[in-house]
Regions:
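Membrane-proximal intracellular helices of multi-pass ion channels
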Residues: 2-183
Length: 183
């Protein structure tokens, strides 16, 4: 009954997009939660798209360590390397930026509500396959945006980052550190 429906709503947005309910019946809050679940995909080694659960765990652990004023983020008795934190932050920022930018382009191009467009872009970048039913009516620009997001979501953020930066040469010297106030 309802327990199976709840499990389905938690698992479906993070995997293959098999759908058992009409998503257009979701409230705005339900759509927002589904968007978040589509962006946070499965674990490493799985075929699920989206941000890996370990990426989110690294970011949450780092945030908690920052709030507690700890020098390093620790998880399961191990220190998380700064490069891992940088990669997690970069990939997460890329996913969120692409999803929001794509949603904005589609919303402006089609005159549709932003939340509806974000639902479609999160599904594309997370390679989930869920839809609110607007995709067949989209113009060429909007469909092209979704195709590019699907490609990014399938190939993966880190792969594209390394491919784009592989020709960059490493600098031998290091610049001095600067303390920047963030808030």
């Amino acid at each position: 009954g309802s327990e199976m429906c709840i499990r389905d709503r938690a698992v479906t947005p993070r995997t293959a997009g098999f759908n058992t309910v009409d998503l257009t019946d979701l409230s705005e809050a339900g759509q927002f939660i589904t968007i978040a679940l589509m962006l946070i995909g499965g674990s490493p080694g799985s075929t699920a798209g989206g941000l890996k659960t370990t990426t989110i765990a690294v970011l949450l652990t780092t945030a908690i360590s920052t709030f507690r004023r700890r020098e390093n983020a620790n998880l399961f008795g191990r220190r998380i390397d700064d490069d891992v934190v940088k990669n997690a932050a970069t990939i997460s920022l890329m996913y969120i930026t692409l999803c929001c930018t794509g949603g904005l382009i589609i919303s402006v191009s089609e005159g549709l509500p932003m939340l509806t467009c974000l639902f479609e872009t999160a599904s594309a970048v997370g390679t989930v396959g869920l839809s609110l039913g607007i995709t067949p009516e989209l113009n060429l620009l909007s469909r092209s945006v979704l195709i590019l997001l699907m490609f990014f979501g399938r190939v993966g953020g880190l792969t594209l980052i390394f491919a784009a930066l592989s020709s960059a040469q490493k600098k031998v010297s290091k610049l001095p550190k600067e303390k920047i106030t963030v808030g």
